[in-house]
């Protein structure tokens, strides 16, 4: 009985060794490439965000309060050199700002999820605010969130380039 038990254990160890030794080096699992449809959807979302950035800036430039507000989420915040502002404060700033010209450069849209995107860019302006020249180059970022089928700005930050 002892011999049979020893033989059984030896056979089990040998079979296990052979089984594990036959496994080759695992090959890396290929990373699936994005489907053309998914890439197209991403490109469409990115183009939509770029259009929204331009539209909200035009509404600001033309002091179109209602048009400007329709792009802002109810919980919108803006951050600039003066501090953190809500939508009402941003609209008040719009009324005190004369934006005569602007141009975007290096715009990049990053999709964080199907409903959240971040636009980063450089903008050069010719502008005054409360009578002071504020012209220059700025770095800006906007976080967009899709709510009830509509993209809304939830956060915008704007800092003058040094």
Protein language model features and the residues they cover:
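Short, low-complexity N-terminal intrinsically disordered segments enriched in polar/charged residues
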Residues: 22-70, 74
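Bacterial N-terminal signal peptides
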Residues: 8-17
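Bacterial N-terminal signal peptides that target proteins for export
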Residues: 1-9
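Surface-exposed, charged secondary-structure patches
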Residues: 93-134
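Short solvent-exposed beta->alpha transition segments
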Residues: 69-105
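Solvent-exposed loop/turn segments at secondary-structure junctions
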Residues: 77, 83-85, 125-127, 159-162
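Short beta-strand segments enriched in hydrophobic/aromatic residues
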Residues: 60, 72, 123-125, 157-160
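Short beta-strand edge/turn micro-motifs at domain boundaries
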Residues: 137-162
